[in-house]
Amino acid sequence: IHGCVLCQGESPLVYMEDVGRHNAVDKIAGWMFLEGVGAADKLLYTTGRLTSEMVIKTAKMGIPVLVSRSGFTAWGVDLARQLGMTLIGRMKGKRFLVLAGQERVVWDADPAAVAEEPRGHRRKGSVEDDAA
């Protein structure tokens, strides 16, 4: 099952899910159309991969920011950059990769603030890996 959430600022507006990632996005598009909801100030979060097709679909909806917990394709990233979209991948907890359009991202004002690692989690290339 794939899910999508349409957000305005930090507030979720609607959640849709489907067995297909594209279908979940289509349900969001349909809801926006039926409710007369504008897209310019919205963010779309999806559980699906950030492929070129997902970027094109989101761009056609007029949504400037596309976020996923999943991975991405090089073509999807290139298209997002060409279209002036913000693309964020691998979002889990407070960690994420800004792949395109980082000028829209408001970074934490406290440089000392760091996300807590999940218990037992070790990242590749971490200091602990080098010491082993």
Set out the residue ranges of the language-model regions.
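Conserved mixed alpha/beta catalytic, RNA-binding, or beta-rich assembly cores of soluble enzyme
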Residues: 1-49, 53-56
